[in-house]
């Protein structure tokens, strides 16, 4: 195991003092360490984080540090290849990558796929990397950073689950809103009509939905759980809704909403009356450490209408919750419902595992 302080000190020794990225459960101790620091920006997507880092280098000539989960490496490929690559603008960057699905760690199916090819992706990009497992690995990483500085190239380190020591700056997640998320979801799935379809986003949303279905035997509608593809739930829901007469309910989170905001605009402008979008807004990246998304600063009523949605609803407490939920369900879409909720309170949430069965059940008419 390694301490976050040791990693940060190595970076600072190499004159790297700027950090940006997308929160990851493997790297949550790093996020906790960087919390509230002026030289740290939580980006909405990995590509955005890389681009922010590029801008920092162009202004300061100092190499930035960009962190992400390896599942988000695909989002980062465009600016990494078309801007920062040695054969393009040759901009030095330091990548810290949380390595889900590494060969030494048992993980979920979607992470196993990406974990297996992560090193090959870095090799294809000619990015030198170090697997950080203990303090002895810092010597190699330090050499690679110095090489990156000298030759204006990109360098990376891979960090596996459980590698980072819990640091003294770690803090428990705090709720920004008071409405219990489980209470709303239970109410929603009780009211959703038979033959309706639900597509829910990655993270806790899908796992909570699956848990509540089973616990209370609420299985009259079918769900598709987005175990990956953060930010793409609304697009999958849109594609389904355009070819179906069934009502489609898209359950999303604020972090995912912001990651690919343009997709919501597409849904608002092209969806039919059977499309219902539900934003569970807890103002945090709940499943990866509770870091703030700053979604509390957004007026979702004005935003949703400017993105093409015909109707907006809002729920922030139990008062009129059932009435508003019923009205939202009955309303012709595309309709948008923002629900201000707490972080997840359910312990030991199950994970979708038999994914082919889930897909086949969902596709039944």
Each PLM stretch: what is its role?
Residues 150, 272-293:
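A short, conserved beta-to-alpha structural element at the edge of catalytic cores
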Residues 75-79, 83, 154-194, 330-365:
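Glycine/aspartate-rich loop-and-adjacent alpha/beta segment that forms the canonical ThDP
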Residues 105-147, 291-327:
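Conserved thiamine diphosphate
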Residues 24-26, 100-101, 159-165, 202-206, ...:
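Glycine-rich beta-alpha junction loops
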Residues 29-98, 207-282:
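Thiamine diphosphate
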Residues 3-15, 169-230:
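Active-site diphosphate/adenylate-binding microenvironment
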Residues 31-32, 77-79, 105-109, 166-172, ...:
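Short acidic, glycine/serine/threonine-rich loops at helix termini
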